[in-house]
Amino acid sequence: IDFMLQSSLHCKVPNGAIDITSLFINLNASTDAPHFIMEFIQGSPTSMVVLLDLLPRKDLALHPEYIEKYYEDTEVDKQRKIIEQLPQARPYLSPSLFVRSAFSPTAVFFTIDCGKGGEGTLEEIVHGHLASVVKGILQIWLDTCASDASEMEEGEREIMVKRDRTVRSKSIEVDLTANLPRMFGPDVSGRIIAEIRKAFGVQEG
Protein backbone atom coordinates (compact mmCIF):
# COMPACT_ATOMS: atom_id res chain seq x y z
CA ILE A 1 0.00 0.00 0.00
CA ASP A 2 1.35 3.40 -1.00
CA PHE A 3 -1.12 5.45 1.04
CA MET A 4 -4.66 5.48 2.39
CA LEU A 5 -6.83 8.59 2.52
CA GLN A 6 -10.06 8.71 4.51
CA SER A 7 -12.15 11.86 4.69
CA SER A 8 -15.55 12.95 6.00
CA LEU A 9 -16.86 16.33 4.88
CA HIS A 10 -20.02 18.02 6.12
CA CYS A 11 -21.35 21.20 4.55
CA LYS A 12 -24.53 23.12 5.27
CA VAL A 13 -26.41 24.30 2.20
CA PRO A 14 -29.59 26.43 1.91
CA ASN A 15 -31.92 23.44 1.75
CA GLY A 16 -30.09 21.14 4.17
CA ALA A 17 -26.61 19.64 4.25
CA ILE A 18 -24.21 17.56 2.18
CA ASP A 19 -22.13 14.78 3.70
CA ILE A 20 -19.28 13.21 1.73
CA THR A 21 -17.46 10.16 3.07
CA SER A 22 -14.48 8.90 1.08
CA LEU A 23 -11.90 6.14 1.31
CA PHE A 24 -9.04 5.81 -1.17
CA ILE A 25 -6.45 3.04 -0.83
CA ASN A 26 -3.67 3.38 -3.37
CA LEU A 27 -1.12 0.69 -4.07
CA ASN A 28 2.53 1.36 -4.88
CA ALA A 29 4.55 0.57 -7.99
CA SER A 30 5.46 -2.97 -6.90
CA THR A 31 2.12 -4.10 -8.32
CA ASP A 32 -0.23 -3.15 -11.14
CA ALA A 33 -3.27 -4.32 -9.15
CA PRO A 34 -6.21 -1.91 -8.95
CA HIS A 35 -6.63 0.73 -6.25
CA PHE A 36 -9.71 0.68 -3.98
CA ILE A 37 -12.11 3.61 -4.06
CA MET A 38 -15.27 4.20 -2.03
CA GLU A 39 -17.29 7.40 -1.80
CA PHE A 40 -20.76 8.17 -0.46
CA ILE A 41 -22.40 11.54 -1.14
CA GLN A 42 -25.58 12.19 0.83
CA GLY A 43 -27.52 15.33 0.00
CA SER A 44 -30.74 14.48 1.82
CA PRO A 45 -32.01 12.01 4.44
CA THR A 46 -33.63 9.94 1.68
CA SER A 47 -31.02 9.82 -1.09
CA MET A 48 -27.32 9.29 -1.70
CA VAL A 49 -24.79 8.72 -4.47
CA VAL A 50 -22.64 5.59 -4.16
CA LEU A 51 -19.24 5.22 -5.86
CA LEU A 52 -17.30 1.96 -5.41
CA ASP A 53 -14.60 0.55 -7.64
CA LEU A 54 -11.40 -1.36 -8.08
CA LEU A 55 -9.74 1.45 -10.02
CA PRO A 56 -7.78 0.01 -12.96
CA ARG A 57 -4.16 1.01 -13.51
CA LYS A 58 -3.86 -0.18 -17.09
CA ASP A 59 -5.68 0.49 -20.35
CA LEU A 60 -8.24 -2.30 -20.25
CA ALA A 61 -8.68 -2.49 -24.02
CA LEU A 62 -4.95 -3.14 -24.42
CA HIS A 63 -4.75 -5.61 -21.53
CA PRO A 64 -7.66 -8.11 -21.65
CA GLU A 65 -5.73 -10.37 -19.26
CA TYR A 66 -5.99 -7.58 -16.66
CA ILE A 67 -9.78 -7.59 -17.00
CA GLU A 68 -9.83 -11.36 -16.67
CA LYS A 69 -7.62 -11.45 -13.56
CA TYR A 70 -9.14 -8.63 -11.52
CA TYR A 71 -12.71 -8.28 -12.79
CA GLU A 72 -13.88 -11.53 -14.42
CA ASP A 73 -12.19 -14.20 -12.30
CA THR A 74 -13.11 -12.37 -9.07
CA GLU A 75 -16.77 -12.02 -10.17
CA VAL A 76 -16.75 -8.51 -8.72
CA ASP A 77 -19.54 -7.48 -11.09
CA LYS A 78 -21.97 -9.56 -9.01
CA GLN A 79 -21.67 -6.88 -6.32
CA ARG A 80 -22.68 -4.13 -8.75
CA LYS A 81 -25.71 -6.14 -9.82
CA ILE A 82 -26.94 -6.35 -6.21
CA ILE A 83 -27.33 -2.56 -6.11
CA GLU A 84 -28.58 -2.40 -9.70
CA GLN A 85 -31.52 -4.64 -8.79
CA LEU A 86 -32.77 -2.32 -6.04
CA PRO A 87 -35.91 -0.46 -7.18
CA GLN A 88 -34.58 2.70 -5.50
CA ALA A 89 -31.31 2.64 -7.47
CA ARG A 90 -30.58 4.23 -10.82
CA PRO A 91 -27.23 4.59 -12.61
CA TYR A 92 -25.21 7.67 -11.70
CA LEU A 93 -23.44 9.44 -14.55
CA SER A 94 -20.63 11.76 -13.53
CA PRO A 95 -20.69 15.05 -15.46
CA SER A 96 -16.97 14.50 -16.05
CA LEU A 97 -16.08 12.36 -19.06
CA PHE A 98 -12.63 11.86 -17.53
CA VAL A 99 -14.12 10.31 -14.39
CA ARG A 100 -16.30 8.00 -16.48
CA SER A 101 -13.29 6.89 -18.54
CA ALA A 102 -11.01 6.26 -15.54
CA PHE A 103 -13.23 3.77 -13.71
CA SER A 104 -13.74 0.10 -14.47
CA PRO A 105 -16.76 -1.44 -16.25
CA THR A 106 -17.74 -3.05 -12.93
CA ALA A 107 -17.81 0.21 -10.95
CA VAL A 108 -20.78 0.64 -8.61
CA PHE A 109 -22.03 4.08 -9.69
CA PHE A 110 -25.59 4.59 -8.49
CA THR A 111 -27.95 7.13 -7.05
CA ILE A 112 -30.19 5.61 -4.39
CA ASP A 113 -33.35 7.67 -3.97
CA CYS A 114 -36.01 6.44 -1.54
CA GLY A 115 -38.40 9.34 -2.12
CA LYS A 116 -40.40 11.39 0.34
CA GLY A 117 -40.57 9.78 3.75
CA GLY A 118 -37.98 7.19 2.79
CA GLU A 119 -35.46 7.83 5.57
CA GLY A 120 -36.04 4.41 7.10
CA THR A 121 -35.79 2.67 3.73
CA LEU A 122 -32.45 4.33 2.96
CA GLU A 123 -31.11 3.34 6.36
CA GLU A 124 -32.16 -0.27 5.75
CA ILE A 125 -30.41 -0.27 2.36
CA VAL A 126 -27.23 1.27 3.81
CA HIS A 127 -27.01 -1.24 6.65
CA GLY A 128 -28.17 -4.16 4.50
CA HIS A 129 -27.46 -4.35 0.77
CA LEU A 130 -24.89 -1.55 0.63
CA ALA A 131 -22.89 -2.74 3.64
CA SER A 132 -22.80 -6.23 2.13
CA VAL A 133 -21.59 -4.92 -1.24
CA VAL A 134 -18.88 -2.76 0.34
CA LYS A 135 -17.62 -5.72 2.37
CA GLY A 136 -17.73 -7.94 -0.71
CA ILE A 137 -15.73 -5.59 -2.93
CA LEU A 138 -13.24 -4.77 -0.18
CA GLN A 139 -12.70 -8.49 0.50
CA ILE A 140 -12.06 -9.11 -3.20
CA TRP A 141 -9.54 -6.26 -3.19
CA LEU A 142 -7.82 -7.59 -0.06
CA ASP A 143 -7.65 -11.14 -1.42
CA THR A 144 -6.65 -10.32 -5.00
CA CYS A 145 -4.98 -6.92 -5.05
CA ALA A 146 -3.58 -5.79 -1.70
CA SER A 147 -0.83 -8.40 -1.41
CA ASP A 148 -0.26 -8.92 -5.12
CA ALA A 149 3.19 -8.40 -6.63
CA SER A 150 3.54 -8.00 -10.39
CA GLU A 151 6.50 -8.65 -12.63
CA MET A 152 6.77 -5.73 -15.03
CA GLU A 153 9.37 -4.37 -17.38
CA GLU A 154 10.76 -1.05 -16.25
CA GLY A 155 9.19 0.82 -19.15
CA GLU A 156 5.80 -0.70 -18.39
CA ARG A 157 6.15 0.27 -14.73
CA GLU A 158 7.02 3.86 -15.66
CA ILE A 159 3.91 4.09 -17.84
CA MET A 160 1.76 2.81 -14.98
CA VAL A 161 3.27 5.27 -12.49
CA LYS A 162 2.68 8.13 -14.93
CA ARG A 163 -0.91 6.98 -15.44
CA ASP A 164 -1.47 6.82 -11.67
CA ARG A 165 -0.13 10.34 -11.26
CA THR A 166 -2.27 11.69 -14.09
CA VAL A 167 -5.44 10.09 -12.69
CA ARG A 168 -4.73 11.49 -9.22
CA SER A 169 -4.01 14.99 -10.49
CA LYS A 170 -7.00 15.09 -12.82
CA SER A 171 -9.29 13.72 -10.11
CA ILE A 172 -8.29 16.56 -7.80
CA GLU A 173 -8.85 19.08 -10.57
CA VAL A 174 -12.23 17.72 -11.66
CA ASP A 175 -13.67 16.87 -8.26
CA LEU A 176 -12.11 18.88 -5.46
CA THR A 177 -10.86 22.06 -7.11
CA ALA A 178 -14.18 22.52 -8.87
CA ASN A 179 -16.48 21.78 -5.93
CA LEU A 180 -14.82 22.42 -2.55
CA PRO A 181 -14.53 26.24 -2.87
CA ARG A 182 -18.30 26.45 -3.32
CA MET A 183 -18.82 24.36 -0.19
CA PHE A 184 -16.21 25.73 2.20
CA GLY A 185 -14.84 28.94 0.69
CA PRO A 186 -11.39 29.49 -0.86
CA ASP A 187 -9.30 29.47 2.34
CA VAL A 188 -10.55 26.23 3.90
CA SER A 189 -10.83 24.43 0.58
CA GLY A 190 -7.33 25.55 -0.37
CA ARG A 191 -5.87 23.96 2.76
CA ILE A 192 -7.84 20.74 2.23
CA ILE A 193 -6.76 20.46 -1.41
CA ALA A 194 -3.12 21.18 -0.52
CA GLU A 195 -3.09 18.34 2.01
CA ILE A 196 -4.74 15.95 -0.43
CA ARG A 197 -2.23 16.89 -3.14
CA LYS A 198 0.56 16.17 -0.66
CA ALA A 199 -0.95 12.77 0.19
CA PHE A 200 -1.46 11.95 -3.49
CA GLY A 201 2.08 13.06 -4.35
CA VAL A 202 1.01 15.46 -7.10
CA GLN A 203 1.90 19.09 -7.65
CA GLU A 204 -0.47 21.86 -8.58
CA GLY A 205 -0.63 22.13 -12.33
Swiss-Prot record:
Gene Ontology MF terms: red chlorophyll catabolite reductase activity
Pathway(s) per entry: Porphyrin-containing compound metabolism; chlorophyll degradation
Subcellular location: Plastid, Chloroplast stroma
GO biological process, one term: chlorophyll catabolic process
Matching InterPro entries: RCC_reductase
GO cellular component, one term: chloroplast stroma
Record-annotated site: Important for substrate stereospecificity: F103
Keywords from the named record: Chlorophyll catabolism, Chloroplast, NADP, Oxidoreductase, Plastid
Keyword Nucleotide-binding: no
Post-translational modification: The N-terminus is blocked.
Reactions performed catalytically: primary fluorescent chlorophyll catabolite + 2 oxidized [2Fe-2S]-[ferredoxin] = red chlorophyll catabolite + 2 reduced [2Fe-2S]-[ferredoxin] + 3 H(+)
Pfam (any one): RCC_reductase
Binding site for substrate: E39, D175
Entry annotated with the keyword Translocase: no
Tissue specificity annotation: In etiolated and green primary leaves. Low amount in roots.
Function: Catalyzes the key reaction of chlorophyll catabolism, porphyrin macrocycle cleavage of pheophorbide a (pheide a) to a primary fluorescent catabolite (pFCC). Works in a two-step reaction with pheophorbide a oxygenase (PaO) by reducing the C20/C1 double bond of the intermediate, RCC.
This protein's name: Red chlorophyll catabolite reductase
Naturally occurring in which organism (per UniProt): Hordeum vulgare (Barley)
Gene: rccR
